[in-house]
Regions:
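Hydrophobic alpha-helical transmembrane bundles of multi-pass membrane proteins
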Residues: 1-355
Length: 355
């Protein structure tokens, strides 16, 4: 079995986790939105690329829309996915150029750029395990998209305090988390075992931390911590005990960072910004700490990818908002996008209501 064959499992895991963490009345729309984003990304990636390139491009496009759920239209999902798929292709080419920058001899006319060339040769970390072109890019995009889309209706009270909107199907989200774990083998099989250690230690840490913080364990935060630990573990590439420590830190930081975003009216029910945006930085920080890489190496790579995704999302979001197609109509969102847009609910046998 080719490693690229695991990527669809990772994509399915992300879709299921988002659908499970969202509202019941928008679960179908969330799933369809994810399929649209994945499909657009795969088609763009397939232009002049291999099947693995197409799947990586589709995964990046999908992850960029995770967390938005039923807050955006299918048009928005398609446009955002197309923009990030193109950004992914550009970032892959840029990474290859920067990674080889130290091997090129600059002509005399460009001699003034020699310090920049030397700086890139030292501090640019190549895109291993698609850490920049997929994960960090998607994390930055998700942050920008969540800020442009705004919170779900009713998520915050008039005094600014967040109102509880519990995940409607945590078992579905849990299945999604396990599929993310299995599918992550596609990014780097040699790093997957260490990443597994980080992921499960992050899961347990998040359960314990939420128990201490809230008085009850919170599975939704635990799944976010699991995802963060998985990506941080892939990014760190360290041995067993350091991977264990990376997971512990990732489990705490994922919860704390998601809560911090919530206080700033960034409604991220999946924790995608922590899992895909912050976790790669935690991974390379672990490399610095345990001497696997020199201090500072990789932070430029991470920053470029996150910034590229963030700017792309803000620009596309502003354009879509200007045309009035960014979000569904408030009446559709309140009544449920499944019924209003598709004429059928994900759970027709149950009464759908807000928790």
């Amino acid at each position: 079995m080719l490693m690229a064959d695991f990527l669809p499992l990772f994509a399915l895991g992300a879709i299921l986790m988002e659908a499970g963490m969202g509202r019941a009345k928008g679960a179908t729309h969330s799933f369809v939105k994810g399929m649209v984003a994945l499909g657009v990304g795969v088609l763009i990636g397939a232009l002049g690329g291999s099947w693995r390139d197409a799947l990586l491009c589709g995964t990046a496009a999908l992850l960029a829309t995770v967390g938005l759920g039923d807050r955006i239209t299918l048009i928005t999902a398609g446009v955002l996915a197309a923009g990030i798929a193109i950004a992914h292709r550009i970032l892959v080419v840029t990474d290859r150029a920067f990674s080889l920058s130290g091997a090129f001899h600059l002509p005399e006319a460009l001699a003034g750029w020699a310090p920049v060339q030397k700086w890139l040769a030292i501090y640019w970390l190549p895109d291993y395990a698609s850490l920049w072109s997929v994960h960090a890019l998607a994390g930055g995009t998700a942050l920008g998209a969540l800020m442009m889309a705004g919170p779900r209706i009713g998520r915050y009270l008039r005094n600014g305090q967040p109102a509880a909107m519990p995940a409607h199907n945590l078992p579905m989200a849990g299945i999604g988390a396990l599929l993310l774990w299995v599918g992550a083998q596609a990014f780097s099989p040699p790093l997957w075992q260490g990443a597994s250690v980080s992921a499960f230690s992050a899961l347990l840490t998040a359960l314990l931390w939420t128990r201490w913080r809230f008085g009850k364990t919170d599975p939704s935060f635990a799944f976010t911590g699991f995802w963060s630990g998985l990506i941080a573990g892939i990014g760190s590439g360290v041995s067993f005990l350091p991977s264990l420590a990376v997971g512990v830190v990732a489990g705490i930081i994922a919860v704390a960072f998601s809560l911090a975003l919530d206080r700033r009216f960034v409604d991220d029910p999946v924790g995608i910004v922590a899992a895909e945006g912050l976790a790669p930085l935690l991974g390379i920080t672990a490399q610095w700490f345990w001497g696997e890489a020199s201090w500072g190496v990789g932070v430029i790579s991470w920053g470029v990818a996150v910034l590229a995704g963030f700017v792309m999302a803000r620009c596309l979001g502003g354009l879509l908002r200007a045309f009035g197609v960014l979000r569904p109509a408030p009446a559709d969102e309140l009544a449920g996008t499944d019924l209003r847009l598709y004429g059928i609910a994900a759970y027709p046998e149950f009464e759908l209501r807000e928790a």
